[in-house]
Amino acid sequence: MSSHARPRSLRALGVLAALSLTVVGLTGCVSRGSDTTSTEAPELVSNDQLATVTLDVGDQKGGTEALLRASGELDSAPYDVAFSTFTSGPPQVEAATAGQIDFAVTGNTPPVFGVAANARIKVVSAYTNDASGDQILVPPDSTLGSFADLRGKKIAVGKGSSAHGHVLLQLQKAGLTTDDVQLVFLQPADALTAFTSGEVDAWAIWDPFTAIAQVQNGSKTLTTAERVANGYGFGVASQQALDDPAKNTALQDFVVRLAKASAWADAHPAEWAAAYSTAVGIDPAAGELAQGRSQRPAIALDDSVIESEQALFDVFVESGSIPGGNTFEDFVDTRYNDAIAAATASTN
């Protein structure tokens, strides 16, 4: 069954960033339950019982949808998929908690904030790259030469995003604290305006925004998250969807298709970069730059991944950004690990 989601075309970085406005209604007051422990997965149902199922999937910058379409992995899905576009991961977690989406791929930090807030979500899949696309940018004429030079300066960053985690880790590495810089919490649309107008000194951001700013505006890299952050991304599912037999079955199939699509992109980098650039309406040079360093193949959601995320959670707690008390492991569900492993093995 083909997805009924419509492709989206974006014309500029500002328009791309402004997509956060489409989900403002999802990020307000959300009722959270106390269900923070893994529950037994319901029995899988047959494919013919998926004919009336629609998976609501949160997307960022068209990445998930574009990847699945370019690879052809959506073509034979026995259920429908409706994509909603978000600019960053935190509102995706909010929407999943509210039951307004069933699944989304986020960076490494939004699930950390979800754990702190007792969000009704589970982390069900993991992805990785070297984090080189997560960068702290400065204007072309900036005289700043290192992260330490940001002492007393203003840094635009999305609260609860992977960029937020990157900044805290850079502060820790430099022996600084959040008191030594001015964090200006802005989503990409407003951060772009603040950055280009000189209202902030630096912008902590991720691809493709990083690549677009570099290609179109000549922005300079002050530092990257490579060898600083863990570079993980995560598939986050709503507890409601996981508890529903039909949606649980569709979700297992979906994460398998996504893993196969990621493997396809790795094997066809030029084709994928061109398809991605067209799908989200960005400069092909920026698309090639972003996808050359920010692809995320699926990996096992194992103890090492969970421990790394717990360490990131602890950094946020120590900074006073989130309350402690919860553990990341309690918000992880590995029910799809075997299916994803089998899928990725078959593509190698």
Where are these regions (language model features)?
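Bacterial N-terminal signal peptides that target proteins for export
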Residues: 2-16
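C-terminal motif of bacterial Sec signal peptides marking the signal peptidase cleavage site
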Residues: 24-28
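Bacterial signal peptide processing site
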Residues: 30-33
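Short, glycine-/small- and polar/acidic-enriched structural segments
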Residues: 35-177, 184-185, 229
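Extracytoplasmic/secreted envelope proteins and their assembly/folding machinery
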Residues: 65-71, 93, 97, 108-111, ...
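Pocket-lining segment of extracytoplasmic ligand-binding domains
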Residues: 109, 184, 189-278
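Secondary-structure end/capping motifs
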Residues: 244-323
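Conserved C-terminal helix/tail region of periplasmic/extracytoplasmic solute-binding proteins
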Residues: 316-348
